[in-house]
């Protein structure tokens, strides 16, 4: 558990100080500046990683881990204990402390004890256990926080003590580490205690989808037929992940998943569930999947249209979209919802055949008021070898400080396009 006064003072190194303060943007800016000064030799983020963990800034620690931090280089005494992490209820903190490079630091007896601790929190309920430990009947302050790069958890503060409600996800993680096979029903129950953005939900879905066995598939099928939209939503994500984690499109559970999602798309009435179902078709392009997507091109809910737009990209071996898909992409690139426009532009870029109607519509997005739309349009035009990407990239300028990693992805397509043109220019 984290209590008031858990962190104090300021580290001398600016990167460590930014990590300790919880300033993710500054952390990324400092790493970029170090890259520039050292001509490509990135500053070691390991000390900042340790500082972020000590301050319980788990999202920053997760980012630093992705950017090269080495947990094995941090002495155990400079990290929170595993018991502190479990009590705090942060799945990301537990993940960092049990990283593959330092997992050997914990004997099985300790992992068993931590599993029992996580189960105790989970079974008691975060609020009830927090009240028991603090002895306070005051009002609990609640908020939602980013725990890692992708998932959020609830955070509760009472009598100067702060905890997160990720104990169910931690329990799932520790059981997997210990080789304990949790029942499908229990994993579903843990997921449905939370919402779709919570770590407990995603962790249960991933664990179940990796079980390429009849029992797990039957669980997805049962959820699909449930009257409760929340249960169907979890079933849709689980079915989608069966397809995502398949070794090939010919794998048994991939075939089953695509068939189920395609049929499901014609019958689902809940927009949130429908969007998840359609997202499940985005990496499998075929006539039936395309027809299921096109059925919802004009859906009244933007999230559904975004799923349609994302699913209409064409794989490299088949460059030509159908006439209906072509028209849908033109329509969706002019959608009133910005995220729909971005998804449609991305899919149009996937086609990469120089189609004039598509490239002209992409080029119209270069004047969009939002930079993220302009970036996507530059990238898509470059993939179509359309020279309009070059001037547009020049107008956008270099990636913004703190956003280099993301924006470089979009701009470098135009840079790659420009280099051959420069090489062939008369000298």
Where is each model-derived feature located?
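TPR-adjacent "capping" and linker segments in tetratricopeptide-repeat scaffold/adaptor proteins
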Residues: 1-10, 188-195, 207-208, 223
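Ankyrin-repeat boundary/"N-cap" motif
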Residues: 8-17, 39-51, 73-86, 106-121, ...
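Structural detector for internal amphipathic alpha-helices that build alpha-solenoid repeat scaffolds
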Residues: 13-20, 46-55, 79-88, 115-116, ...
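Ankyrin repeat structural motif
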Residues: 23-31, 57-66, 90-98, 126-127
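Ankyrin-repeat C-terminal turn/loop position
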Residues: 34-36, 68-70, 101-102
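Amphipathic alpha-helical scaffolding segments comprising HEAT/armadillo-like alpha-solenoid repeats
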Residues: 36, 60, 72, 180-189, ...
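Short inter-helical turns and helix N-cap capping residues of alpha-solenoid HEAT/ARM repeat scaffolds
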Residues: 227-228, 269-270, 300-301, 336-337, ...
């Amino acid at each position: 558990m984290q209590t008031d006064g858990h962190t104090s003072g300021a580290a001398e190194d600016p990167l460590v100080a930014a990590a300790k303060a919880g300033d993710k943007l500054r952390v990324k800016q400092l790493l970029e500046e170090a890259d520039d000064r050292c001509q490509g030799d990135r500053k070691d983020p390991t000390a900042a990683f340790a500082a972020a963990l000590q301050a319980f800034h788990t999202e920053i620690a997760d980012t630093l881990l992705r950017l090269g931090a080495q947990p094995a280089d941090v002495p155990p005494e400079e990290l929170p204990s595993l018991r502190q992490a479990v009590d705090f209820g942060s799945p990301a903190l537990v993940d960092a402390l049990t990283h593959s490079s330092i997992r050997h630091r914990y004997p099985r007896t300790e992992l068993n004890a931590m599993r029992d601790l996580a189960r105790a929190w989970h079974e008691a309920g975060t609020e009830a256990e927090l009240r028991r430990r603090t002895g306070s009947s005051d009002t609990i302050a609640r908020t939602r926080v980013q725990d890692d790069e992708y998932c959020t958890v609830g955070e509760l503060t009472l009598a100067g003590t702060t905890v997160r409600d990720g104990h169910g996800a931690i329990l799932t993680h520790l059981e997997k580490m210990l080789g304990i096979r949790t029942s499908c029903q229990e994993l579903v129950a843990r997921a449905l205690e939370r919402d779709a953005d919570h770590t407990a939900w995603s962790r249960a879905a991933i664990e179940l989808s990796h079980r390429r066995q009849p029992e797990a598939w039957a669980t997805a099928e049962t959820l699909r037929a449930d009257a409760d939209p929340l249960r169907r939503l979890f079933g849709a994500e689980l079915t989608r992940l069966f397809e995502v984690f398949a070794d090939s499109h010919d794998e048994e559970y991939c075939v089953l998943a695509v068939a189920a999602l395609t049929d499901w798309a014609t019958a689902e009435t809940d927009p949130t569930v429908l969007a998840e179902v359609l997202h499940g078709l985005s990496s499998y392009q075929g006539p039936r999947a395309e027809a299921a997507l096109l059925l919802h091109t004009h859906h009244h809910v933007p999230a559904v249209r975004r799923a349609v737009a994302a699913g209409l990209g064409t794989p490299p071996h088949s460059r030509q979209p159908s006439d209906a898909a072509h028209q849908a992409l033109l329509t969706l690139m002019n959608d009133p919802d910005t995220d729909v426009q971005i998804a449609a532009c991305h899919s149009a870029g996937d086609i990469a055949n120089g189609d004039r109607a598509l490239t002209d519509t992409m080029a119209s997005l270069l004047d969009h008021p939002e930079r993220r739309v302009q970036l996507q349009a530059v990238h898509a035009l470059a993939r179509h070898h359309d020279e309009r990407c070059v001037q547009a990239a020049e107008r956008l300028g270099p990636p913004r400080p703190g956003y280099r990693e993301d924006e470089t992805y979009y701009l470098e397509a135009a840079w790659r396009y420009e280099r051959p043109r420069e090489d062939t220019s008369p000298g």
